[in-house]
Regions:
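Active-site-flanking beta-strand signature of metal-NTP-handling nucleotidyl enzymes
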Residues: 2-9, 51-53
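Short beta-strand micro-motifs enriched in acidic
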Residues: 42-44, 95
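An amphipathic, aromatic/His-enriched active-site/gating alpha helix that lines ligand/cofactor pockets
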Residues: 24, 28-38, 54-88
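Short, low-order "capping/linker" segments at domain edges
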Residues: 91-97
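Residues at the C-termini of beta-strands that transition into short coil/loop
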Residues: 45, 90-91
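Short coil/turn motifs at secondary-structure junctions
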Residues: 11-13, 46, 57-59
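Short acidic/glycine-enriched loop/turn segments that link adjacent beta-strands
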Residues: 36, 45-48
Length: 97
């Protein structure tokens, strides 16, 4: 199992477009229901900073990379950003649900 976090800040002008593209990814996920992934996305406060957390059962098998909506989202992400994406590996300490 592997968990990664991606955090970045878009321009104010691109924040809504970015959010719409994220919603398209979730629509694809709900339609296709891939196994082996847990995926969450957050907008930090009311600003233009976003955070995504993906937990993959198999680190070498990321179902997101097979989704056209995710590929479209990623394609121009750097162009929408004022703070580029930072990818971090996360190690679990505890969880409660």
């Amino acid at each position: 199992m592997k968990t990664i976090m991606v955090r970045y800040t878009t321009t104010e002008a691109h924040a809504l477009t970015n959010e719409e593209m994220i919603r398209a990814v979730f629509a694809d996920l709900h339609a296709r229901m891939p196994k082996g992934i847990r995926y969450d996305s957050y907008r930090v406060g009311i600003g233009a900073t976003f955070m995504h957390i993906a937990t993959l059962d198999a680190p070498d098998d990321n179902p997101l990379t097979t989704l056209p909506s995710f590929l479209a989202f990623q394609k121009q992400l750097k162009d929408r950003c004022v703070e580029p994406p930072v990818v971090s590996d996360l190690s679990p300490v505890g969880s409660y649900r």
